[in-house]
UniProtKB/Swiss-Prot annotation:
Similarity remark: Belongs to the PsbB/PsbC family. PsbC subfamily.
Main location: plastid
Source organism: Chlorella vulgaris
Membrane topology: Multi-pass membrane protein
UniProt keyword Transmembrane present: yes
Name recorded for this polypeptide: Photosystem II CP43 reaction center protein
Gene: psbC
Keyword Transferase: no
Amino acid sequence: MKNLYSLRRFYHVETLFNGSLVVGGRDQESTGFAWWAGNARLINLSGKLLGAHVAHAGLIVFWAGAMNLFEVAHFVPEKPMYEQGLILLPHLATLGYGVGPGGEVIDTYPYFVSGVLHLISSAVLGFGGVYHSLVGPETLEESFPFFGYVWKDKNKMTTILGIHLIVLGFGAWLLVWKAMYFGGIYDTWAPGGGDVRIISNPTVSPGVIFSYILKSPFGGDGWIVSVDNMEDVIGGHIWIGTLCIFGGIWHILTKPWAWARRAFVWSGEAYLSYSLGAIALMGFTACCMSWFNTTAYPSEFYGPTGPEASQSQTFTFLVRDQRLGANVASAQGPTGLGKYLMRSPTGEIIFGGETMRFWDFRGPWLEPLRGPNGLDLNKLKNDIQPWQERRAAEYMTHAPLGSLNSVGGVATEINAVNYVSPRSWLATSHFCLGFFFFVGHLWHAGRARAAAAGFEKGIDRDNEPVLSMRPLD
Protein backbone atom coordinates (compact mmCIF):
# COMPACT_ATOMS: atom_id res chain seq x y z
CA MET A 1 0.00 0.00 0.00
CA LYS A 2 1.37 3.42 -0.96
CA ASN A 3 1.56 5.36 2.30
CA LEU A 4 1.50 9.13 2.25
CA TYR A 5 2.76 9.26 5.81
CA SER A 6 5.79 7.57 7.31
CA LEU A 7 4.86 4.46 9.27
CA ARG A 8 8.19 4.79 11.05
CA ARG A 9 6.85 7.79 12.98
CA PHE A 10 3.32 6.60 13.47
CA TYR A 11 2.26 8.26 16.74
CA HIS A 12 -1.36 9.30 16.61
CA VAL A 13 -2.43 12.78 17.53
CA GLU A 14 -6.02 11.53 17.74
CA THR A 15 -6.70 9.95 21.15
CA LEU A 16 -9.85 7.84 20.85
CA PHE A 17 -11.89 6.40 23.65
CA ASN A 18 -12.57 3.50 21.30
CA GLY A 19 -9.65 3.11 18.95
CA SER A 20 -10.73 -0.30 17.74
CA LEU A 21 -13.90 0.91 16.04
CA VAL A 22 -14.05 -0.28 12.42
CA VAL A 23 -16.20 1.63 9.91
CA GLY A 24 -16.44 0.49 6.30
CA GLY A 25 -13.61 -1.99 6.78
CA ARG A 26 -11.16 0.81 7.60
CA ASP A 27 -9.97 1.34 11.16
CA GLN A 28 -7.51 3.71 12.74
CA GLU A 29 -4.74 1.15 12.84
CA SER A 30 -4.80 0.45 9.10
CA THR A 31 -5.36 3.98 7.84
CA GLY A 32 -3.79 6.23 10.44
CA PHE A 33 -7.05 8.14 10.84
CA ALA A 34 -10.05 7.74 13.11
CA TRP A 35 -13.54 7.16 11.70
CA TRP A 36 -14.54 10.79 12.21
CA ALA A 37 -11.64 12.00 10.05
CA GLY A 38 -13.87 11.24 7.07
CA ASN A 39 -12.19 11.32 3.69
CA ALA A 40 -8.70 11.21 5.22
CA ARG A 41 -9.24 7.44 5.53
CA LEU A 42 -9.54 7.32 1.74
CA ILE A 43 -6.28 9.09 0.91
CA ASN A 44 -4.86 6.06 -0.86
CA LEU A 45 -8.18 4.66 -2.13
CA SER A 46 -8.77 6.65 -5.31
CA GLY A 47 -12.01 4.85 -6.18
CA LYS A 48 -13.62 5.47 -2.79
CA LEU A 49 -12.38 9.06 -2.74
CA LEU A 50 -13.98 9.54 -6.16
CA GLY A 51 -17.26 8.30 -4.69
CA ALA A 52 -17.01 10.75 -1.80
CA HIS A 53 -16.38 13.66 -4.16
CA VAL A 54 -19.17 12.75 -6.58
CA ALA A 55 -21.61 12.30 -3.68
CA HIS A 56 -20.54 15.67 -2.31
CA ALA A 57 -21.19 17.26 -5.70
CA GLY A 58 -24.61 15.61 -5.67
CA LEU A 59 -25.43 17.17 -2.29
CA ILE A 60 -24.36 20.60 -3.53
CA VAL A 61 -26.44 20.36 -6.70
CA PHE A 62 -29.39 18.92 -4.75
CA TRP A 63 -29.35 21.94 -2.45
CA ALA A 64 -29.21 24.26 -5.46
CA GLY A 65 -32.19 22.58 -7.12
CA ALA A 66 -34.30 22.18 -3.98
CA MET A 67 -33.63 25.72 -2.77
CA ASN A 68 -34.30 27.02 -6.28
CA LEU A 69 -37.74 25.37 -6.33
CA PHE A 70 -38.41 26.51 -2.76
CA GLU A 71 -37.75 30.12 -3.78
CA VAL A 72 -39.94 29.75 -6.88
CA ALA A 73 -42.78 28.34 -4.77
CA HIS A 74 -42.59 31.26 -2.32
CA PHE A 75 -41.93 33.99 -4.88
CA VAL A 76 -44.38 36.91 -5.03
CA PRO A 77 -43.93 38.75 -8.36
CA GLU A 78 -45.37 42.00 -6.98
CA LYS A 79 -42.58 42.38 -4.41
CA PRO A 80 -38.88 42.97 -5.07
CA MET A 81 -36.70 39.88 -4.82
CA TYR A 82 -34.62 41.45 -2.08
CA GLU A 83 -37.70 41.80 0.15
CA GLN A 84 -38.34 38.07 -0.01
CA GLY A 85 -35.05 36.69 1.30
CA LEU A 86 -34.11 35.19 -2.07
CA ILE A 87 -30.49 34.42 -2.96
CA LEU A 88 -30.78 32.04 -5.95
CA LEU A 89 -33.46 33.72 -8.07
CA PRO A 90 -31.47 37.00 -8.09
CA HIS A 91 -28.57 35.13 -9.66
CA LEU A 92 -30.81 33.67 -12.36
CA ALA A 93 -32.38 37.08 -12.95
CA THR A 94 -28.93 38.65 -13.28
CA LEU A 95 -28.22 36.13 -16.05
CA GLY A 96 -31.21 37.58 -17.91
CA TYR A 97 -33.70 34.78 -17.25
CA GLY A 98 -37.34 35.73 -16.74
CA VAL A 99 -36.87 39.49 -16.36
CA GLY A 100 -37.59 42.56 -18.44
CA PRO A 101 -37.08 46.34 -18.22
CA GLY A 102 -36.32 47.62 -14.73
CA GLY A 103 -35.69 44.11 -13.46
CA GLU A 104 -39.39 43.27 -13.41
CA VAL A 105 -40.01 39.52 -13.35
CA ILE A 106 -42.18 38.61 -16.33
CA ASP A 107 -41.79 34.81 -16.34
CA THR A 108 -40.91 32.42 -13.52
CA TYR A 109 -40.87 29.31 -15.73
CA PRO A 110 -37.08 29.53 -16.43
CA TYR A 111 -36.52 29.45 -12.67
CA PHE A 112 -38.63 26.31 -12.36
CA VAL A 113 -36.69 24.68 -15.21
CA SER A 114 -33.39 25.55 -13.50
CA GLY A 115 -34.52 23.93 -10.26
CA VAL A 116 -35.70 20.75 -11.98
CA LEU A 117 -32.50 20.43 -14.02
CA HIS A 118 -30.42 20.72 -10.87
CA LEU A 119 -32.54 18.12 -9.07
CA ILE A 120 -32.21 15.66 -11.96
CA SER A 121 -28.45 16.28 -12.11
CA SER A 122 -28.18 15.70 -8.36
CA ALA A 123 -29.86 12.31 -8.73
CA VAL A 124 -27.31 11.26 -11.34
CA LEU A 125 -24.44 12.49 -9.18
CA GLY A 126 -25.94 10.88 -6.09
CA PHE A 127 -26.16 7.52 -7.85
CA GLY A 128 -22.55 7.87 -9.02
CA GLY A 129 -21.44 8.75 -5.51
CA VAL A 130 -23.15 5.75 -3.94
CA TYR A 131 -21.88 3.44 -6.69
CA HIS A 132 -18.25 4.46 -6.35
CA SER A 133 -18.45 4.49 -2.55
CA LEU A 134 -19.98 1.02 -2.17
CA VAL A 135 -19.70 -0.97 -5.42
CA GLY A 136 -16.92 0.40 -7.61
CA PRO A 137 -13.24 -0.55 -7.30
CA GLU A 138 -11.42 0.75 -4.23
CA THR A 139 -8.58 1.98 -6.38
CA LEU A 140 -8.66 3.15 -9.99
CA GLU A 141 -5.01 2.64 -10.88
CA GLU A 142 -5.39 -1.01 -11.94
CA SER A 143 -8.74 -0.90 -13.78
CA PHE A 144 -8.77 2.66 -15.12
CA PRO A 145 -5.17 3.92 -15.24
CA PHE A 146 -6.20 7.17 -16.94
CA PHE A 147 -8.24 8.10 -13.86
CA GLY A 148 -5.76 6.64 -11.38
CA TYR A 149 -3.08 8.65 -9.65
CA VAL A 150 -0.41 8.65 -6.99
CA TRP A 151 -0.21 11.83 -4.92
CA LYS A 152 3.55 12.08 -5.35
CA ASP A 153 3.36 11.75 -9.15
CA LYS A 154 4.09 15.37 -10.03
CA ASN A 155 3.37 14.97 -13.74
CA LYS A 156 -0.02 13.35 -13.11
CA MET A 157 -0.94 16.01 -10.55
CA THR A 158 -0.26 18.86 -12.97
CA THR A 159 -2.23 16.99 -15.65
CA ILE A 160 -5.21 16.85 -13.27
CA LEU A 161 -4.67 20.55 -12.53
CA GLY A 162 -4.75 21.23 -16.27
CA ILE A 163 -8.04 19.37 -16.70
CA HIS A 164 -9.57 21.40 -13.88
CA LEU A 165 -8.37 24.66 -15.43
CA ILE A 166 -9.91 23.77 -18.79
CA VAL A 167 -13.26 23.02 -17.13
CA LEU A 168 -13.12 26.34 -15.25
CA GLY A 169 -12.22 28.18 -18.45
CA PHE A 170 -15.15 26.56 -20.23
CA GLY A 171 -17.41 27.73 -17.40
CA ALA A 172 -16.20 31.31 -17.79
CA TRP A 173 -16.86 31.12 -21.52
CA LEU A 174 -20.42 29.89 -20.86
CA LEU A 175 -21.20 33.28 -19.32
CA VAL A 176 -19.60 35.02 -22.31
CA TRP A 177 -21.72 33.01 -24.76
CA LYS A 178 -24.88 33.66 -22.75
CA ALA A 179 -24.20 37.40 -22.69
CA MET A 180 -23.15 37.70 -26.34
CA TYR A 181 -25.25 35.14 -28.22
CA PHE A 182 -27.91 33.44 -26.10
CA GLY A 183 -30.37 36.07 -24.97
CA GLY A 184 -28.06 38.53 -23.32
CA ILE A 185 -27.64 39.37 -19.66
CA TYR A 186 -29.26 41.83 -17.27
CA ASP A 187 -27.49 45.19 -17.27
CA THR A 188 -28.46 47.54 -14.47
CA TRP A 189 -26.86 50.41 -16.43
CA ALA A 190 -29.15 50.05 -19.46
CA PRO A 191 -30.97 53.35 -20.15
CA GLY A 192 -34.22 53.85 -18.30
CA GLY A 193 -33.41 51.78 -15.23
CA GLY A 194 -31.89 48.50 -16.41
CA ASP A 195 -32.81 45.82 -18.94
CA VAL A 196 -31.67 42.56 -20.50
CA ARG A 197 -29.35 43.28 -23.41
CA ILE A 198 -26.85 41.56 -25.68
CA ILE A 199 -23.24 42.48 -24.80
CA SER A 200 -22.07 42.86 -28.39
CA ASN A 201 -18.83 44.74 -27.73
CA PRO A 202 -17.06 43.30 -24.66
CA THR A 203 -13.83 44.87 -23.46
CA VAL A 204 -10.86 42.82 -24.62
CA SER A 205 -8.14 45.43 -24.11
CA PRO A 206 -5.59 43.91 -21.71
CA GLY A 207 -4.77 47.40 -20.46
CA VAL A 208 -8.32 47.84 -19.21
CA ILE A 209 -8.91 44.31 -17.92
CA PHE A 210 -5.60 43.88 -16.10
CA SER A 211 -5.73 47.38 -14.63
CA TYR A 212 -8.42 46.00 -12.30
CA ILE A 213 -5.99 43.35 -11.05
CA LEU A 214 -3.28 45.95 -10.44
CA LYS A 215 -5.54 48.33 -8.52
CA SER A 216 -5.28 48.67 -4.77
CA PRO A 217 -8.02 46.81 -2.85
CA PHE A 218 -8.28 49.71 -0.39
CA GLY A 219 -10.15 53.00 -0.35
CA GLY A 220 -11.90 54.02 -3.52
CA ASP A 221 -9.73 51.88 -5.79
CA GLY A 222 -11.58 48.68 -5.04
CA TRP A 223 -9.48 46.16 -7.01
CA ILE A 224 -11.74 44.00 -9.25
CA VAL A 225 -14.73 44.89 -7.06
CA SER A 226 -14.72 48.32 -8.71
CA VAL A 227 -15.91 46.98 -12.09
CA ASP A 228 -18.80 49.22 -13.16
CA ASN A 229 -19.94 48.12 -16.62
CA MET A 230 -21.05 44.89 -18.25
CA GLU A 231 -18.58 45.20 -21.13
CA ASP A 232 -15.70 44.88 -18.67
CA VAL A 233 -17.39 42.02 -16.78
CA ILE A 234 -17.83 39.95 -19.94
CA GLY A 235 -14.42 40.96 -21.30
CA GLY A 236 -12.88 39.83 -18.04
CA HIS A 237 -14.52 36.44 -18.45
CA ILE A 238 -13.16 36.20 -21.99
CA TRP A 239 -9.67 36.77 -20.63
CA ILE A 240 -9.95 34.50 -17.60
CA GLY A 241 -11.64 31.76 -19.63
CA THR A 242 -8.99 31.87 -22.33
CA LEU A 243 -6.12 31.97 -19.84
CA CYS A 244 -7.57 29.03 -17.90
CA ILE A 245 -7.97 26.93 -21.05
CA PHE A 246 -4.47 27.68 -22.37
CA GLY A 247 -3.03 27.25 -18.89
CA GLY A 248 -4.79 23.91 -18.63
CA ILE A 249 -3.37 22.75 -21.96
CA TRP A 250 0.08 23.90 -20.82
CA HIS A 251 -0.13 21.91 -17.57
CA ILE A 252 -1.35 18.79 -19.38
CA LEU A 253 1.45 18.86 -21.95
CA THR A 254 4.35 19.81 -19.66
CA LYS A 255 6.02 18.51 -16.54
CA PRO A 256 6.73 20.72 -13.52
CA TRP A 257 10.00 22.62 -13.74
CA ALA A 258 12.73 22.00 -11.18
CA TRP A 259 11.97 25.11 -9.13
CA ALA A 260 8.30 24.07 -8.86
CA ARG A 261 9.24 20.54 -7.82
CA ARG A 262 11.40 21.96 -5.05
CA ALA A 263 9.03 24.74 -3.96
CA PHE A 264 5.84 22.74 -3.44
CA VAL A 265 4.90 19.92 -1.13
CA TRP A 266 3.55 17.09 -3.29
CA SER A 267 0.97 15.27 -1.16
CA GLY A 268 -2.80 14.94 -0.95
CA GLU A 269 -3.01 17.14 2.13
CA ALA A 270 -0.84 19.79 0.49
CA TYR A 271 -3.19 19.92 -2.50
CA LEU A 272 -6.10 20.24 -0.07
CA SER A 273 -4.40 23.19 1.61
CA TYR A 274 -3.73 24.90 -1.74
CA SER A 275 -7.39 24.48 -2.69
CA LEU A 276 -8.63 25.81 0.64
CA GLY A 277 -6.41 28.87 0.29
CA ALA A 278 -7.78 29.57 -3.18
CA ILE A 279 -11.38 29.12 -2.02
CA ALA A 280 -10.75 31.45 0.94
CA LEU A 281 -9.57 34.16 -1.45
CA MET A 282 -12.67 33.61 -3.59
CA GLY A 283 -14.88 33.80 -0.48
CA PHE A 284 -13.42 37.12 0.65
CA THR A 285 -13.68 38.48 -2.90
CA ALA A 286 -17.32 37.36 -3.20
CA CYS A 287 -18.02 39.01 0.17
CA CYS A 288 -16.78 42.39 -1.05
CA MET A 289 -18.32 41.99 -4.50
CA SER A 290 -21.81 41.20 -3.16
CA TRP A 291 -21.63 44.01 -0.60
CA PHE A 292 -20.28 46.87 -2.72
CA ASN A 293 -20.87 46.09 -6.39
CA THR A 294 -24.11 46.99 -8.18
CA THR A 295 -23.06 45.88 -11.68
CA ALA A 296 -22.48 42.17 -11.07
CA TYR A 297 -25.05 42.26 -8.25
CA PRO A 298 -27.82 44.58 -9.51
CA SER A 299 -29.71 46.43 -6.79
CA GLU A 300 -33.00 45.59 -8.51
CA PHE A 301 -32.52 42.00 -7.32
CA TYR A 302 -30.16 42.19 -4.34
CA GLY A 303 -31.33 45.47 -2.84
CA PRO A 304 -29.34 48.70 -2.53
CA THR A 305 -25.83 48.91 -1.13
CA GLY A 306 -25.29 50.87 2.07
CA PRO A 307 -24.05 54.00 0.27
CA GLU A 308 -26.86 53.65 -2.27
CA ALA A 309 -29.58 53.56 0.40
CA SER A 310 -28.04 56.59 2.10
CA GLN A 311 -27.75 58.63 -1.11
CA SER A 312 -31.27 57.68 -2.16
CA GLN A 313 -32.66 59.02 1.13
CA THR A 314 -31.19 62.48 0.60
CA PHE A 315 -32.32 62.38 -3.04
CA THR A 316 -35.87 61.46 -1.99
CA PHE A 317 -36.12 64.38 0.44
CA LEU A 318 -34.55 66.72 -2.09
CA VAL A 319 -37.31 65.79 -4.56
CA ARG A 320 -40.04 66.22 -1.93
CA ASP A 321 -38.86 69.53 -0.53
CA GLN A 322 -38.08 70.98 -3.95
CA ARG A 323 -41.72 70.35 -4.88
CA LEU A 324 -42.73 72.15 -1.69
CA GLY A 325 -40.75 75.21 -2.73
CA ALA A 326 -37.39 74.73 -1.04
CA ASN A 327 -34.33 76.15 -2.74
CA VAL A 328 -32.25 72.98 -2.64
CA ALA A 329 -29.12 74.74 -3.87
CA SER A 330 -28.82 77.16 -0.95
CA ALA A 331 -30.73 75.60 1.97
CA GLN A 332 -28.54 75.10 5.03
CA GLY A 333 -28.63 72.14 7.36
CA PRO A 334 -28.17 72.21 11.15
CA THR A 335 -24.38 72.22 10.82
CA GLY A 336 -24.26 75.18 8.48
CA LEU A 337 -23.36 72.98 5.54
CA GLY A 338 -25.73 72.42 2.66
CA LYS A 339 -28.91 70.59 3.67
CA TYR A 340 -29.49 68.98 0.27
CA LEU A 341 -26.43 69.85 -1.79
CA MET A 342 -22.90 70.95 -1.00
CA ARG A 343 -19.46 71.01 -2.51
CA SER A 344 -16.83 68.36 -1.87
CA PRO A 345 -13.34 69.57 -0.85
CA THR A 346 -12.33 69.41 -4.51
CA GLY A 347 -15.37 71.32 -5.73
CA GLU A 348 -17.82 68.71 -7.04
CA ILE A 349 -21.49 69.21 -6.22
CA ILE A 350 -22.55 66.33 -3.96
CA PHE A 351 -25.48 65.48 -1.71
CA GLY A 352 -25.32 67.25 1.65
CA GLY A 353 -25.95 65.98 5.14
CA GLU A 354 -24.74 62.72 6.60
CA THR A 355 -24.58 61.04 3.18
CA MET A 356 -21.68 63.30 2.18
CA ARG A 357 -19.41 60.42 3.24
CA PHE A 358 -20.78 58.44 0.28
CA TRP A 359 -20.16 61.25 -2.20
CA ASP A 360 -18.44 58.89 -4.68
CA PHE A 361 -21.41 56.52 -4.99
CA ARG A 362 -22.40 55.76 -8.57
CA GLY A 363 -25.73 54.21 -9.49
CA PRO A 364 -27.82 53.95 -12.65
CA TRP A 365 -30.70 55.93 -11.13
CA LEU A 366 -28.41 58.84 -10.21
CA GLU A 367 -25.82 59.10 -12.99
CA PRO A 368 -28.17 60.75 -15.54
CA LEU A 369 -28.38 63.72 -13.15
CA ARG A 370 -24.66 64.39 -13.12
CA GLY A 371 -22.79 67.00 -15.11
CA PRO A 372 -19.11 67.73 -15.68
CA ASN A 373 -18.65 68.80 -12.04
CA GLY A 374 -20.73 66.46 -9.95
CA LEU A 375 -24.50 66.71 -9.67
CA ASP A 376 -26.04 69.10 -12.21
CA LEU A 377 -28.30 71.67 -10.55
CA ASN A 378 -30.29 72.29 -13.71
CA LYS A 379 -30.97 68.56 -14.16
CA LEU A 380 -32.00 68.22 -10.51
CA LYS A 381 -34.53 71.02 -11.00
CA ASN A 382 -35.92 69.96 -14.38
CA ASP A 383 -34.94 66.43 -15.46
CA ILE A 384 -35.71 64.05 -12.59
CA GLN A 385 -37.78 61.16 -13.98
CA PRO A 386 -40.56 59.32 -12.11
CA TRP A 387 -38.67 56.01 -12.26
CA GLN A 388 -35.71 57.63 -10.51
CA GLU A 389 -37.95 58.91 -7.73
CA ARG A 390 -39.61 55.51 -7.29
CA ARG A 391 -36.30 53.66 -7.31
CA ALA A 392 -34.76 55.99 -4.72
CA ALA A 393 -37.80 55.87 -2.44
CA GLU A 394 -37.73 52.07 -2.53
CA TYR A 395 -33.99 51.89 -1.86
CA MET A 396 -34.21 54.45 0.94
CA THR A 397 -36.33 52.09 3.03
CA HIS A 398 -34.31 48.96 2.25
CA ALA A 399 -30.81 49.64 3.52
CA PRO A 400 -28.71 46.46 3.88
CA LEU A 401 -28.83 46.34 7.66
CA GLY A 402 -29.21 43.20 9.72
CA SER A 403 -28.29 41.39 12.89
CA LEU A 404 -27.44 37.92 14.11
CA ASN A 405 -31.02 37.13 15.09
CA SER A 406 -32.22 37.94 11.57
CA VAL A 407 -34.13 41.05 12.65
CA GLY A 408 -33.07 43.43 9.94
CA GLY A 409 -33.36 47.12 9.36
CA VAL A 410 -33.04 50.16 11.59
CA ALA A 411 -33.17 49.55 15.33
CA THR A 412 -35.90 52.18 15.79
CA GLU A 413 -38.32 50.47 13.39
CA ILE A 414 -40.83 47.79 14.28
CA ASN A 415 -40.10 44.34 12.89
CA ALA A 416 -43.02 44.54 10.45
CA VAL A 417 -41.16 47.05 8.28
CA ASN A 418 -37.74 45.50 8.66
CA TYR A 419 -36.06 42.97 6.43
CA VAL A 420 -32.64 41.40 5.97
CA SER A 421 -30.99 42.30 2.68
CA PRO A 422 -29.57 39.51 0.50
CA ARG A 423 -26.41 41.62 0.46
CA SER A 424 -26.19 41.19 4.24
CA TRP A 425 -26.65 37.43 3.96
CA LEU A 426 -24.25 36.96 1.05
CA ALA A 427 -21.52 39.24 2.37
CA THR A 428 -21.63 37.86 5.91
CA SER A 429 -21.82 34.20 4.89
CA HIS A 430 -18.99 34.50 2.38
CA PHE A 431 -16.79 36.36 4.84
CA CYS A 432 -17.34 33.70 7.51
CA LEU A 433 -16.87 30.84 5.03
CA GLY A 434 -13.78 32.52 3.60
CA PHE A 435 -12.35 32.90 7.10
CA PHE A 436 -12.90 29.26 8.04
CA PHE A 437 -11.54 28.05 4.72
CA PHE A 438 -8.45 30.17 5.38
CA VAL A 439 -8.05 28.60 8.83
CA GLY A 440 -8.39 25.20 7.13
CA HIS A 441 -5.73 26.24 4.65
CA LEU A 442 -3.32 27.09 7.48
CA TRP A 443 -4.15 23.88 9.35
CA HIS A 444 -3.68 21.51 6.43
CA ALA A 445 -0.67 23.41 5.09
CA GLY A 446 1.01 23.02 8.47
CA ARG A 447 0.22 19.30 8.61
CA ALA A 448 1.38 18.77 5.02
CA ARG A 449 4.69 20.53 5.65
CA ALA A 450 5.17 18.58 8.86
CA ALA A 451 4.42 15.31 7.07
CA ALA A 452 6.97 16.16 4.39
CA ALA A 453 9.51 16.78 7.15
CA GLY A 454 8.65 13.46 8.79
CA PHE A 455 7.12 14.50 12.12
CA GLU A 456 3.44 14.93 11.30
CA LYS A 457 2.17 12.67 14.07
CA GLY A 458 3.65 14.58 17.00
CA ILE A 459 5.89 13.27 19.78
CA ASP A 460 5.68 9.92 21.52
CA ARG A 461 3.56 10.54 24.62
CA ASP A 462 4.87 7.37 26.26
CA ASN A 463 8.23 9.01 26.91
CA GLU A 464 7.12 12.41 28.17
CA PRO A 465 8.96 13.53 31.34
CA VAL A 466 5.72 14.67 32.96
CA LEU A 467 4.56 11.06 33.21
CA SER A 468 7.30 10.30 35.75
CA MET A 469 6.61 13.32 37.97
CA ARG A 470 4.58 13.16 41.18
CA PRO A 471 0.94 14.32 41.16
CA LEU A 472 0.22 17.92 42.14
CA ASP A 473 -1.74 16.87 45.25
